[in-house]
């Protein structure tokens, strides 16, 4: 026997087994079809950031449905880099130049708790908000949820503004590229999350504001149940008037004129010209659609696509889709806060040298209201004026627009932009849905939130504004104060709520000591009220 040869074989075998064992035992190394990636140890959790799920949406792939990422990694992929924002004209960037991000941005980031008691975790997939125009995956934090250690979190980046939503309403330039990005990311999660210790059968899709509306739109695909077990829309749903808008074709050609494509006569030539322009030029042109400040806040947003559009997300009015029953029949929850409209109204209290912005409404209400409240493309000029006068009289009466009447104006914004459409969505789901439909209203003002930032003032009590609940789950830069003791309890309750919802076998939902009541088949709305020191189930004929 050749003992030298046998010994060499044994040594090499041990080296091979040892190297593979170390890869297996190293939680920072993850094997994917593309190759291996290395994450970061953050003490209480592991992170794997900026993982591409789609080919870069640049060049010929701009204004196209995303293509799955195909590249193989010859070296270990570095998954320790903070995800870049998708290219945008950002409302919250100070100064005149608000251009932020990169066109090549389609990544997911995975965050996994350290928990020796579990071999696998349910998964919460997160779609960030930002009116479909701005925002980034990194802007919503993960320290709170990782501290609790209940689920794996996956943050999704998707195309925004004109790069994500410009549309001519035909198959040449159908739009909704950002929504198609989200859907491809969900497929990536389904196929790959087990490699990180996630449970692909227990995925909950969540989002806030435009993220919440995105969740609802994704759910309206009949096969959504193949991608997620449940869905949660915080302060945003498919029926909000700022979500699916009309007039997209006109804005697409206006964008073309603004960037030197004025000779384009049809969708094909417009698309070709827009593809030839620098991405930064297209996104910077957003400012030409704003009549003042960042109004309207969503000039480019989801549209109804033609039925022959490639990989169409939605081709019918969401109301008709829900009535048909042909949508993802999974448990769904929706929410609003008592002054959600503070996000949209607060900038009107910003002070200038010439006075407060709200003063302008006294002379320009008929001009500005259709942009502020998103009915400029749905009514004739006469009907717009009549409606503007009607809602002013209903909410403001004969008062002037000023700081004294601001609370009534904020209530108008809350009702029209959030609450009324939340009620309508829930009403449709309770009548035509087969899976549980839940709702909550939150009333517990934060010491600092989005309204104080936009108004640049702390001397006004805005109430419970857009994000005051959600930012207790996923931290946000607009809230730079410590949580109060009551908010710490609420934060834990929210996080436990999501963890349980992600893995619930029967679709039940619970917050703290309160079980949500299902709205499907109920004559009255079942609404869970969440406030500073508890929760309570309430029944309503109409939302309070």
From Swiss-Prot:
Its main location: secreted. InterPro entries: AB_hydrolase_fold, CarbesteraseB, Carboxylesterase_B_AS, Carboxylesterase_B_CS. Changing residue 500 to N: In strain: Zim-F-S18, Zim-S-H32 and Zim-S-S2. The keyword Cell wall biogenesis/degradation does not apply. Keywords: Disulfide bond, Glycoprotein, Hydrolase, Secreted, Serine esterase, Signal. It is an enzyme of class 3 (hydrolase). Specifically expressed in the ejaculatory bulbs of male. Its EC number is 3.1.1.1. Transmembrane segments: none annotated. The active site is at residues 209, 466. Residues 1-21 form the signal peptide. One of its GO terms (molecular function) is carboxylesterase activity. CDD domains: Esterase_lipase. It comes from the Eukaryota. Disulfide bonds join 86-105, 261-273, 514-535. Changing residue 371 to H: In strain: F-775F. Changing residue 363 to D: In strain: F-775F. It catalyses: a carboxylic ester + H2O = an alcohol + a carboxylate + H(+). PANTHER family: CARBOXYLIC ESTER HYDROLASE (PTHR43142:SF1). Transferred from the ejaculatory bulbs of males to the female genitals upon copulation, plays an important role in the reproductive biology. Monomer. This is Esterase-6. It comes from Drosophila melanogaster (Fruit fly).
